[in-house]
Amino acid sequence: MKVAVEGCCHGELDKIYESISYLENKDGVKVDLLLCCGDFQAVRNEGDMKCMAVPAKYRHMQTFYKYYSGEKKAPVLTIFIGGNHEASNHLQELPYGGWVAPNIYYLGYAGVIRYKGVRIGGLSGIFKSHDFKKGHFEFPPYNPETLRSVYHIRNIDVFKLKQIKMPIDIFMTHDWPRGIYHYGNTNALLRQKKFLRQEVESSTLGSPAAADLLEHLQPSYWFSAHLHVKFAALMQHEAKNNTAPKITKFLSLDKCLPHRDFLQIVEVADRPGSSEQLEYDPEWLAILKATDNLQKPTCNFWNPPQDNGLHSRWDFSASEEAMMEVVSDLSGDLCIPENFSLTVPPYDPSQPQPHALPAYSTNPQTTELCATLNLTDIYILAGQSGQIYGERGGKGATEEEDEEDSTGSADEPSDFPSDTSGLSSSYNPDEITIEDEWEEEEDGGVGCGEGKGMDAVVPEGQVGSQDSDRDSSPQRETAKRLILPAPCAKPKTEAPLHSLPRLSLPPPSACVSQGSSEEEGAFTAARVPKRTSGETTQSSAGQTGGTPQIKRRNQSIYTAVEDEESDS
């Protein structure tokens, strides 16, 4: 089958689909599938833009809202992962993946699905060592720290992916696997991106977590983006168990701009007789069920179970029996239901609302999947955790939880001791760099981290001390039995969707990233400091004038001709 691969989307769906149509007519082919490697920007309305980690000058509605509202429908089945410029409040509704619009599917924090028998997996976000060992604790309204940390990948998701034993055909990450540049034309890469030389020569460019997954999964194809350059590589893996060594074809593509290599069609062998619809992957769903109790919505460090004598179980790979149980849970039907529904009002160009506050809601797709497989909605779990932590004075966790979550972590080195992701001295002038390049201004509009607009659909579940057994914790039980409003019957409706129940939000996350807001330090194994109630009060008082606007240092770098072209 013909698979179109896109680098960074940046919300330019109209242009991408037009480019695919042009290639189809030019080459006489029919594209079966589009894969987008992050920075998708599924922005539904003006409120979503305030939950996207880009400076205000780069916040543009683009064209996704047309596909969300039903004005248009994607002409090609589209699958995407998240990057570091996303409408995070939208994607957090779908931690296990789901439809963001008809015919457009998000893979979630991590996921594996099937199309025409081809196994397609992905990992959303980018790697930052200081957040890697934390749980998915972020919950809107975001503060300036969580607005960035929310898209950092976590070891729980990497751990789940490392339980996969069956072959993967295609895998996607936003940032590159560390070291992959040594398997392609490195000199040509450095001629195009001279600022990468230091990190390439020191083998510190890219994600060590992705490199770990590349070694474990050894997929046939690996697609990435992030660096805004086309680069291909061919990696031969070491032979295992007396079998022939596997080969991974790596391809990274540019962002969607004129005269840039942002799209390429790849021919992938499908499996005759396989379903023409997207399908769940039984092995992956069995892994999700097995690891459900490992979810910890905390900003304290957590290490996955290991065969070190401290854990009763460390292998969460899927047995044949577990996979058959998943198939039974789905009543034998692996086809992913086309159950998209609106959860917030779409953008209306005739009635712009530039001061609209972000809206937050649970998603019926996630609720349905969790009910079917008895999974925990990570988004709700984080929200419940935020409520509990907020009522404890914003300290982030009790002493018991802190002790439990940091066991085996506080005194251990990083999983990737060579990681220098916080020490990168190079910058990509072609990238809208957010990490630690923000400076505050005195005046500013309302942002997602301000803590206003507390009208999200969030469960009010029982609040109390957590038991040591996480299976019986109030927040987990509430997360599993939350009853959602009925989804919209049509993709486009006259009603403004204000009929959705509105419940109180927890306060903004009290956890503070270990990296400085000015310059990220190297990864340390120190325990995450807690914020005292006094600090929380002071922070809240400082926000009464509205969340400060953000600007970058070195603005002159971003006035390149290509950016002017993109603005036009």
From Swiss-Prot:
Cofactor: how and how many bound: Binds 2 divalent metal cations per subunit.
Biased composition (Basic and acidic residues): 467-480
UniProt modified residues of type Phosphothreonine: 478
Compositional bias ranges of the Low complexity kind: 534-549
Binding residues for a divalent metal cation 1: 8, 10, 228
GO biological process, one term: mRNA splicing, via spliceosome
Compositional bias (Polar residues): 417-428
CDD domains on file: MPP_Dbr1_N (cd00844)
SMART domains xrefs: DBR1 (SM01124)
GO molecular function terms noted in the UniProt entry: metal ion binding; RNA lariat debranching enzyme activity
Annotated family: Belongs to the lariat debranching enzyme family.
Localisation: Nucleus
Main location: nucleus
UniProt feature, compositional bias: Acidic residues: 432-444
Activation and inhibition: Active in presence of diverse metals including Fe(2+), Zn(2+), Mn(2+). Also activated by Ca(2+). Binds two metal cations in two adjacent alpha and beta metal-binding pockets.
Required cofactor names: Fe(2+); Zn(2+); Mn(2+)
Protein name: Lariat debranching enzyme
EC number per UniProt: 3.1.4.-
Record's function text: Cleaves the 2'-5' phosphodiester linkage at the branch point of excised lariat intron RNA and converts them into linear molecules that can be subsequently degraded, thereby facilitating ribonucleotide turnover. Linked to its role in pre-mRNA processing mechanism, may also participate in retrovirus replication and have an antiviral cell-intrinsic defense function.
UniProtKB keywords: Hydrolase, Iron, Manganese, Metal-binding, mRNA processing, Nucleus, Phosphoprotein, Zinc
Region entry Disordered, spans: 388-568
